[in-house]
Amino acid sequence: MAANYWASSQLTQLFLSTDLESLEPTCLSKDTIYQWKVVQTFGDRLRLRQRVLATAIVLLRRYMLKKNEEKGFSLEALVATCIYLSCKVEECPVHIRTICNEANDLWSLKVKLSRSNISEIEFEIISVLDAFLIVHHPYTSLEQAFHDGIINQKQLEFAWSIVNDSYASSLCLMAHPHQLAYAALLISCCNDENTIPKLLDLIKSTDAFKVILCVQRIISIYYFEDIE
């Protein structure tokens, strides 16, 4: 397991090192928003921590990006499996029987999910991702900013919810976790003239332009449905 993001597979193997502007059409869409809502709905039913759901959606997005051919798995089956896998990765395992039962109760699937279905899809996802399953999230940078006294509890909670909302897009594949965290902090602290200078000092350590692009993309999430 790579404790250091800069040495992790997330950066060295799975990061989309491209311009956010060129990927705007695929960064946010009805599909990405719907996928995140499905993950949240199923995760809430299982009463899982937000970090588990975030890992699940990242695994789902990685898989959908890298798969070479259509396997015919339904979105619901993929979500259930990604959450099952995410629970293992985040060390809060849920029994496969519980995953199947809750999925079948929640969704009216043509074919009921079985343990063998989940195991098959789990193997497929692990194979496609070459077993690179560890996910680094922006939450760590948010917590660090709070512990360093840069932000207060209310600002931390607001930024946390903004990071949660960012998973409705594919930004998690295109920006470094700390850049997403800084973008969320800029939004949550935009009216605090005492905190903004401290955040600007933080941003100096990274690509400030990309942080601003992340701010724009995150804000667009809240307007997307109105625009559509």
Curated annotation (Swiss-Prot):
* Domain annotation Cyclin N-terminal: ranges: 10-134
Q: Which domain of life is it from?
A: Eukaryota
Q: Which GO terms describe its biological process?
A: positive regulation of transcription by RNA polymerase II
Q: What is its main location?
A: nucleus
- Cellular compartment(s): Nucleus
Database matches in Gene3D superfamilies: Cyclin-like
Q: Which InterPro entries match?
A: Cyclin-like_dom (IPR013763), Cyclin-like_sf (IPR036915), Cyclin/Ssn8 (IPR043198), Cyclin_N (IPR006671)
Q: Name one GO molecular function term.
A: transcription coactivator activity
One family name in Pfam for this protein: Cyclin_N
Q: A Gene Ontology CC term for this entry?
A: nucleus
Kindly state which keywords UniProt assigns to this record, in alphabetical order.
Activator, Cyclin, Nucleus, Repressor, Transcription, Transcription regulation
* UniProt function note: Component of the Cdk8 module/Srb8-11 module which is a regulatory module of the Mediator complex that regulates basal RNA polymerase II transcription. The Cdk8 module may sterically hinder the interaction between Mediator and RNA polymerase II leading to transcriptional repression of a subset of genes regulated by Mediator.
In the record, the note on similarity to other proteins reads: Belongs to the cyclin family. Cyclin C subfamily.
How this chain assembles, per its entry, is: Component of the Cdk8 module of the Mediator complex. The Cdk8 module is composed of srb8, srb9, srb10 and srb11.
- What is this protein called in UniProt? RNA polymerase II holoenzyme cyclin-like subunit
Organism of this sequence: Schizosaccharomyces pombe (strain 972 / ATCC 24843) (Fission yeast)
